[in-house]
UniProtKB/Swiss-Prot annotation:
Gene Ontology biological-process entries: translation
Subunit (UniProt): Part of the 30S ribosomal subunit. Forms a tight complex with proteins S10 and S14.
SMART domains for this protein: KH (SM00322)
Gene name per UniProt: rpsC
Functional summary from the UniProt entry: Binds the lower part of the 30S subunit head. Binds mRNA in the 70S ribosome, positioning it for translation.
GO cellular component: cytosolic small ribosomal subunit
Gene Ontology molecular functions: mRNA binding; rRNA binding; structural constituent of ribosome
InterPro entries cross-referenced by the UniProt entry: KH_dom, KH_dom-like_a/b, KH_dom_type_2, KH_sf_prok-type, Ribosomal_S3_C_sf, Ribosomal_uS3_bac-typ, Ribosomal_uS3_C, Ribosomal_uS3_CS
Organism: Brevibacillus brevis (strain 47 / JCM 6285 / NBRC 100599)
Protein name: Small ribosomal subunit protein uS3
C-alpha cells in the first residue's frame, strides 16, 4: 500500500496535518474550488520564489493563506509591495478578507517539492536527466536526509519512446507511518514534450519507536 499511495496523504492524521483547515456543509464544493484557484494563482505568480506548500484556513468571512517559501524576500517584495498586491488580488478573487503569512523554509534541499522543481528546471535548461538527479540527491543527503528517491518519466534525452528512470540513495521506508517522508512532483516543459519528476525524501522518524516506549515503561 505504501508503494502506491501518496506518502503525504497516507500520513495525514498520524504525523501530518491538512493543508486546508476549514469545515463547510453546503458550500464545500465552492470553497474547495476557491482553494484550488488560490493555490493555482499563487503558484503561477510566485513561480520563481521557490514556493512549496500553501496552507489555507477559513473563519467566517476571512481567509488566512500561509505561504511556505525558500525565498521570502521575493514574495514580500520591496517594502512589502509584492505581498500587498498579492493580498488585494486574492481579495478580489475570493470576495473575502485575505490575510497572508510568509514562512521561510530554512533547508530547501530537504523539501521534496522544491527538489523536484529544481530537477525540472535543470531538464528545461537541457542538463542531462541523470546528472540533474544525482546532483540533487547529493545535495539532499548533505543537508541531513536519511534517504531520497527520484524518478523522471517521459521522452528522456529526446528518445522516441517514453520511459522512466530513477535513482535511490539511503532508506525510504514508505510503509512506516512514523517515518517523516516528504513527497513532491513537478513537470519540465521541454521541446520533446513534458517530463514528469517525482521525489521522495526521508527526513527521519517523528514518533518514538515501540521498543523505546516499552523500555521506558519497563524502567519506571
Amino acid at each position: 500500500m505504501g508503494q502506491k499511495v501518496s506518502p503525504v496523504g497516507l500520513r495525514i492524521g498520524v504525523i501530518r496535518d491538512w493543508e486546508s483547515k476549514w469545515y463547510a456543509d453546503k458550500d464545500f464544493a465552492t470553497l474547495l474550488h476557491e482553494d484550488l484557484k488560490i493555490r493555482k494563482y499563487v503558484k503561477g505568480r510566485l513561480k520563481d520564489a521557490a514556493v512549496s506548500t500553501i496552507e489555507i484556513e477559513r473563519a467566517a468571512n476571512r481567509v488566512n493563506v500561509t505561504i511556505h517559501t525558500a525565498k521570502p524576500g521575493m514574495v514580500i517584495g520591496k517594502g512589502g509591495s509584492e505581498v500587498e498586491t498579492l493580498r488585494k488580488t486574492l481579495t478580489d478573487l475570493t470576495g473575502k478578507r485575505v490575510h497572508i503569512n510568509i514562512n521561510e523554509i530554512k533547508r530547501p534541499d530537504l523539501d521534496a517539492t522544491l527538489v523536484a522543481e529544481n530537477i525540472a528546471r535543470q531538464l528545461e535548461n537541457r542538463i542531462s536527466f541523470r546528472r540533474a538527479q544525482k546532483q540533487s540527491i547529493t545535495r539532499t543527503l548533505r543537508s541531513g536526509a536519511k534517504g531520497i528517491k527520484t524518478l523522471v518519466s517521459g521522452r528522456l534525452g529526446g528518445a522516441d519512446i517514453a520511459r522512466s528512470e530513477g535513482y535511490s540513495e539511503g532508506t525510504v521506508p514508505l510503509h512506516t507511518l512514523r517515518a517523516d517522508i516528504d513527497y513532491g512532483t513537478a513537470e519540465a516543459h521541454t521541446t520533446y514534450g513534458r517530463i514528469g519528476v517525482k521525489v521522495w525524501i526521508y527526513r527521519g522518524e517523528v514518533l518514538p519507536a515501540r521498543k523505546n516506549v516499552a523500555t521506558e515503561e519497563g524502567g519506571k
